[in-house]
């Protein structure tokens, strides 16, 4: 029975590049998938495209493709990625340019768009899930609205001979599912097989998480050679049999436990994992070690997909200003607490208008606030003050006040930093599937 091998080349936009090179060189893979598009990333990319119509794709696209494209071309590996972000056409054009510059010969590149529904949402009565308000009520602040497209357009592109597929917003598991459907000729309403293929995608989509990265905890869950963490590979057979593994000799490990942690990642209901392709059921999933770093996956089923697609909605939510400064040595905690009180009072005196303010001592209460039992007094703390404002001018003033602690006390502050930036916040909606029409464009290198 025929088997294919799919490698995960990235788990987020800024991920390491050398594990993908290792997969292409030593992984004996047929497909290399780069998942680089977090929820907020595409809204940021949309802003970049508005400022420059030739931008809006992933900032590391060029560096990644320069590293892996020659190897993939040589070894006959197809590449699928959502690094197109807000501008798949520009991303595909850049890949064509790289291929030509490197003299790689003939290459067919597919750019998949159609996920951008922001203009439709601006005049839509579609409800925002978190607020219940109609999307049209946010028209003036909307930055982006992208539907999670499924595997179908990628399957079509592969059938038409694409060597590289550059997409915008697609569901993460769908990029791994598409080659399985294409290679094995699975019907896209064979729900159990589509469910199995989706489980493959969910296990691989975060890259090194399933090979022990996110799993590692010294003394409890030790993982060797994390500095050389290998990224995962799925071996998938035509009948849906699955083995998760990694490049032999690479760092990290693939075990029942790493797979169990990853299958639960971002899953609210294991019995009803909704994707554009299927309603997958992970509730009876099994993981069995068949050899070191080789985990067999079973028990996954699927049901019919929904009539709606999730839309990730990005909107302008003001401006965030931040300032930080450190105190060390005896009395560091007391000086840090005094610094916070001074800044709090200064913001009142100077009339800074902030919708939200937060005052933290990093290393003391910035994560758990005051819910944990008191720890021994630290000998170093870092003050952090941040606030969300309606204007950049007001946001800048927050960091400025923290910086003035340098000379205005308390004693011995150092390492002050400040920043101010626009806030792009995220909401979600459900949009009719039949109103989202993917578009495929082909470029020849």
Predicted regions span which residues?
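Gly-rich Lys/Arg/Thr-decorated short loops/hinges at beta-loop-alpha junctions or inter-strand turns
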Residues: 1-3, 39-55, 73, 117-141
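C-terminal non-catalytic interaction/assembly regions of soluble proteins
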Residues: 298-445
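N-terminal amphipathic/basic leader segments beginning at the initiator methionine
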Residues: 1-24
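Catalytic or ion-translocation cores adjacent to nucleophile or general acid/base/metal-coordination motifs
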Residues: 100-117, 177-218
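Flexible, glycine/charged-enriched surface loops at secondary-structure junctions
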Residues: 105-109, 210-222, 270-289, 345-362, ...
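A conserved active-site cap/scaffold subdomain adjacent to cofactor or substrate pockets
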Residues: 194-299
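Active-site glycine-rich loop that binds ribose-phosphate moieties when present
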Residues: 144-158
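N-terminal glycine-rich anion-binding loops that anchor highly charged ligand groups
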Residues: 27-45
């Amino acid at each position: 029975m025929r088997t294919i091998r799919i490698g995960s080349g990235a788990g987020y936009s800024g991920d390491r590049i050398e594990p993908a090179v290792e997969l292409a060189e030593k992984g004996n893979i047929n497909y290399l998938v780069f998942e680089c598009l977090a929820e907020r990333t595409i809204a940021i990319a949309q802003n970049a495209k508005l400022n420059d119509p030739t931008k809006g794709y992933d900032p590391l696209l060029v560096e990644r493709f320069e590293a892996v494209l020659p190897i993939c071309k040589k070894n006959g590996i197809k590449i699928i990625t959502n690094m197109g972000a807000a501008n798949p056409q520009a991303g595909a054009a850049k890949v064509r340019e790289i291929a030509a510059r490197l003299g790689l010969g003939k290459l067919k590149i597919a750019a998949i768009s159609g996920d951008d529904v922001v203009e439709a949402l601006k005049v839509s009565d579609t409800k925002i899930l978190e607020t219940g308000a109609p999307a049209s009520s946010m028209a003036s602040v909307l930055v982006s609205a992208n539907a999670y497209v499924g595997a179908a357009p990628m399957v079509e592109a592969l059938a038409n001979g694409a060597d590289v597929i550059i997409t915008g917003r697609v569901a993460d598991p769908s990029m791994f599912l598409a080659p399985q459907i294409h290679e094995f000729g699975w019907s896209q309403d064979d729900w159990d097989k589509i469910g199995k293929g989706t489980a493959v995608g969910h296990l691989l989509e975060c890259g090194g998480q399933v090979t022990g990265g996110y799993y590692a905890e010294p003394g409890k869950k030790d993982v060797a050679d994390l500095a050389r963490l290998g990224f995962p590979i799925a071996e998938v057979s035509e009948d849906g049999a699955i083995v998760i593994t990694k490049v032999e000799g690479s760092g990290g490990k693939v075990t029942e436990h790493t797979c169990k942690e990853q299958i639960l990642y971002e899953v609210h209901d294991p019995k009803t994992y909704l994707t554009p392709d299927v309603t997958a059921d992970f509730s009876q999933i099994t993981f069995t070690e068949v050899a070191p770093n080789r985990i067999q996956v079973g028990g996954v089923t699927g049901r019919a997909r929904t009539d709606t697609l999730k839309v990730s909605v990005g909107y302008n939510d003001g401006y965030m200003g931040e300032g930080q400064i450190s105190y060390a040595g005896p009395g560091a905690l007391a000086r840090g607490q005094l610094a916070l009180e001074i800044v709090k009072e200064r913001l009142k005196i100077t009339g800074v208008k902030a919708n939200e303010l937060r005052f933290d001592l990093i290393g003391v209460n910035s994560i758990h606030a005051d819910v944990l039992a008191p720890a021994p007094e630290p000998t170093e703390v870092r003050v952090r003050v941040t606030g969300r404002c309606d204007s950049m001018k007001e946001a800048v003033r927050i960091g400025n006040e923290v910086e003035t602690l340098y000379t205005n006390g308390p004693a011995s502050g150092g390492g002050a930093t400040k920043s101010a930036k626009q806030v792009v916040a995220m909401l979600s909606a459900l949009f009719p599937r039949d109103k989202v029409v993917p578009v495929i464009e082909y470029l020849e290198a």
